[in-house]
Design a protein with these regions (language model features):
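An alpha-helical interface "stripe"
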Residues: 1-175
Length: 175
């Protein structure tokens, strides 16, 4: 059996690069190896927010918030998923909400100092209709999934094309 796989050739290099930049590896099921000790990470099933990381960051950024404020913010984000606004309400929560902060964007230094960064592989994402998918790599800030990366072996044109079509279908928005 070859010591090289799709994981070792295309998934691990960007994952290791993100970890070298300060991203903390997290796992939905938990993972303990010679190199990684990741406890099981809880996530909100509707938003895929990593609840423990989100709550910790929320109270760091909003120290005078009430005890249930982080949970209320997750509920607010859940409700915003029903909007056909292309994520505008969520954008406003991150960038324009001056009362409660969920990500510190006040300056580049504060961004790195006051936020936490996580990365996961093969994290199941989906919606209430059961449309689930597992991106190769998901990137989080303060437990909030903000980006995902799909990786393919070089010269895998059929795989790249198939993934492109899946994304077009999955992320279509009403006109």
């Amino acid at each position: 059996m070859s010591s090289f796989s799709e994981d070792s050739r295309v998934k691990f290099p960007p994952l290791m690069h993100l970890m070298s930049m300060g991203y903390n590896y997290v796992s939905q099921k938990g993972l303990k190896t010679k190199y990684v000790n990741a406890l099981e990470t809880k996530s909100d099933p509707l938003t895929n927010i990593l609840t423990d990381y989100f709550t910790e960051a929320y109270f760091k950024l909003n120290p005078s918030a009430e005890l249930d404020a982080a949970e209320k913010m997750i509920n607010k984000i859940q409700k915003s998923l029903n909007n056909d606004d292309l994520g505008r309400q969520f954008y406003n929560e991150i960038f324009l909400n001056t009362g409660e902060r969920i990500i510190d964007l006040s300056s580049p230094n504060n961004f790195y100092r006051n936020n936490t960064f996580q990365v996961a592989t093969e994290m199941t994402c989906g919606n209430k209709d059961g449309d689930n998918f597992r991106p190769d790599i998901t990137i989080f800030v303060n437990g909030i999934p903000l980006a995902f990366i799909e990786v393919k072996k070089e010269n895998n044109h059929k795989g790249i094309q198939a993934e492109t079509e899946r994304m077009k279908t999955r992320f279509t928005t009403p006109a």
